[in-house]
């Protein structure tokens, strides 16, 4: 492996153990990503009536996911600034403790409302963990090693995505649904011990001031907007006064947030960053990737478990190709960038993601399962060749001491993109499903029975023999809704591909290309 000369700002002792530190940082990252990937497998179980689950409706499931995501996204900037000011290690340790406590409380939830609240607590902790891991990484690696380290760090996301659904499936096969949250606690304890022992502290010598007004405006605006979108899907009526009013209020508050940030002398988001088209495109497309990914993951669980009849563990195994592809290709994506350039590699990766999203529109109840496996694998290949290069572009666009802010900005767009993906594509799914099943429901059926396939099948179970006639129409209506939703996600992904083709830089210069390729190849041996 190539060993670079330590930067004068990096102590020699820290430089020597930088790869071990990277491993500890990946463990902390693993906890945050693992939780969301585990939850993806558990959403069907949580939607099952008590005592098996909590009987959560589709809109409550969307909020259980988005309560975490919105708090996470809204506090990332403040978390990054606190890390810059107080020290990234201290903030990382505090975030892990809060995340662990939130996980234990979520496991003991007695209702969907409690689960939503405790997921928000978990989001609070995660907001301090995610940016701190990447900020510490940027302060223990030299600039020429950062792409390699970020590639491995991104591969850790793939590892978490790989083991999350499988772990969740194993837990749900043997324990109650709350075990998918309780599993976080021992991992948090292990990470805290290693962090105290190995990870150095770092801070920005000239940190910015906290921006409480900006944080409040961003969180309130996002919550109102997402509420309006989810409510529209729940009612299957986006012209409802409540839906229009809350969505418009959310957009107005977000507009006020942008105006305030431009005028503030200590903004959460430095709007001058977005004058750089490359930086803006990279940040925006990261949001688009997570918009599509979170939406597809949401409906694919119901497709595999409800329509195809697979268990949670089998569903986790079915998702393995998606994660394996990311794990294998993320650390090597930089080689493709060195050869072909960011624009070509990222555009091709995003186009592949769009094609695989569109492929869901041809899946039905008896499609050979190997086709789904190929779709998941190729989607993972596409993600690896988009996320890793874009992460490098974003992190290297700012000085080392601003690493916390760059990481927070990147992760904010991921989380906001994912939240909007769940809200928008979840609402498309709900609206399309209601349109396909409403005429099949018996007279007097509750309005909620048409909100999701799980609600319809629960009604069918209560009706006994009379309800058996609802099963096939429910499956057919869900498949139609999944096809519509997948095509919407594919369209959004294609817009991201076009943006990257236009704005991202092309192939690097020869000298730099050769140097980076030599180091990356050496790292792989």
Task: Indicate where each model-derived feature is located.
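Transmembrane alpha-helical cores of Major Facilitator Superfamily
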Residues: 30, 66, 70, 97, ...
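Residue-level signature of the transmembrane alpha-helical cores
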Residues: 28, 94-98, 102, 118, ...
């Amino acid at each position: 492996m190539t060993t670079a000369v330590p930067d004068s700002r990096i102590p020699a002792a820290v430089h020597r153990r930088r790869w071990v530190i990277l491993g500890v940082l990946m463990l902390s990252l693993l906890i945050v990503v693992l939780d969301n990937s585990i939850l993806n497998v558990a959403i069907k179980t949580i939607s099952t009536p008590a005592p098996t689950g909590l009987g959560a409706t589709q809109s409550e499931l969307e909020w259980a996911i988005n309560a975490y995501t919105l708090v996470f996204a809204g506090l990332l900037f403040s978390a990054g600034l606190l890390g810059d000011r107080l020290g990234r290690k201290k903030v990382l340790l505090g975030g892990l403790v809060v995340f662990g406590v939130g996980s234990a409380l979520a496991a003991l939830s007695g209702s969907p409302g409690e689960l939503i609240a405790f997921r928000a607590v978990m989001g609070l902790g995660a907001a301090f963990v995610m940016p701190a891991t990447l900020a510490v990484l940027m302060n223990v690696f030299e600039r020429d090693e950062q792409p390699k380290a970020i590639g491995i760090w991104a591969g850790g996301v793939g590892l978490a995505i790989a083991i999350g659904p499988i772990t969740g499936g194993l837990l749900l096969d043997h324990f109650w649904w709350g075990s998918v949250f309780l599993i976080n606690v021992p991992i948090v304890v292990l990470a805290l011990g290693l962090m105290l022992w190995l990870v150095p502290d770092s801070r920005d010598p000239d940190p910015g001031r906290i921006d409480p007004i900006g944080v409040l405006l961003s969180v309130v605006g996002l919550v109102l907007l997402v509420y309006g979108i989810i409510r529209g899907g729940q009612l299957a009526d986006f012209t409802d006064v409540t839906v229009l009013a809350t969505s418009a209020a959310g957009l107005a508050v977000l507009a006020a947030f942008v105006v305030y940030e431009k005028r503030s002398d200590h903004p959460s988001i430095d709007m001058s960053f977005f004058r750089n088209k490359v930086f803006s495109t990279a940040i925006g497309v990261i949001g688009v990737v997570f918009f599509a990914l979170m939406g597809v993951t949401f409906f694919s669980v119901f497709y595999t478990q409800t329509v195809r009849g697979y268990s949670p563990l089998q569903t986790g195994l079915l998702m393995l190709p998606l994660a394996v592809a990311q794990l294998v290709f993320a650390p090597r994506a930089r080689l493709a960038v060195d050869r072909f350039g960011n624009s070509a590699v990222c555009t091709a990766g995003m186009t592949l993601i769009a094609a695989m999203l569109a492929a869901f529109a041809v899946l039905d109840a008896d499609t050979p399962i190997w086709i789904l496996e190929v779709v998941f694998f190729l989607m993972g290949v596409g993600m690896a060749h988009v996320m890793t290069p874009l992460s490098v572009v974003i992190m290297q666009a700012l000085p080392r001491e601003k690493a916390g802010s760059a990481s927070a900005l990147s992760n904010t767009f991921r989380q906001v993109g994912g939240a909007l993906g769940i809200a928008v594509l979840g609402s498309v799914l709900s609206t399309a499903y209601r349109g396909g099943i409403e005429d099949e429901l018996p007279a007097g059926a509750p309005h909620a029975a048409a909100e999701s396939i799980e609600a319809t099948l629960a009604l069918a179970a209560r009706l006994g023999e009379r309800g058996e006639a609802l099963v096939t129409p429910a499956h057919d209506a869900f498949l139609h809704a999944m096809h519509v939703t997948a095509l919407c996600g594919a369209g959004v992904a294609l817009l991201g591909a076009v943006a990257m083709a236009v704005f991202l830089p092309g192939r690097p210069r020869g000298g730099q290309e050769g140097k980076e390729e030599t180091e990356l190849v050496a790292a792989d041996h």
